[in-house]
Amino acid sequence: MSLMDPLANALNHLTNCERVGKKVFYIKPASKLIGRVLKVMQDHGYIGEFEFIEDGRAGIFKVELIGKINKCGAIKPRYAVKKHEFEKFEKRYLPARDFGLLIVSTSQGIMTHYEAKEKGIGGRLISYVY
């Protein structure tokens, strides 16, 4: 059986493991998109270290949890957002102003909505975390 949305599955699994109180969990299958989203979350202090483990197939990410995530998830459909429209989606997906992140895929790579606003570029919404 193939997964329809590996990113949504990984983020849902991350939220569930965080609620249960696990310290380490594994994401299978791994992908570049999931790795880049994990890197953004690590840079902003939501997860600890993570590493890619080669298993002869798609690979596995081993992720250390530090108890900072209340909720995270994929945004479906992947809305196209212009540089001045981020506030509308902040109100929809984040619980309060300046609390949490929207992760955006832009022409310059995957980044937070704060970085995209700062650079003056739009993109497609991928996920949220707070």
Swiss-Prot record:
Domain of life: Archaea
Keywords: Ribonucleoprotein, Ribosomal protein, RNA-binding, rRNA-binding
UniProt family annotation: Belongs to the universal ribosomal protein uS8 family.
Listed InterPro entries: Ribosomal_uS8, Ribosomal_uS8_CS, Ribosomal_uS8_sf
Assembly and binders: Part of the 30S ribosomal subunit.
Name this protein carries in UniProt: Small ribosomal subunit protein uS8
GO cellular component, one term: ribosome
One Gene Ontology MF term: structural constituent of ribosome
Lineage: Archaea, Methanobacteriati, Methanobacteriota, Methanomada group, Methanococci
Presence of the UniProt keyword RNA-binding in the record: yes
Function: One of the primary rRNA binding proteins, it binds directly to 16S rRNA central domain where it helps coordinate assembly of the platform of the 30S subunit.
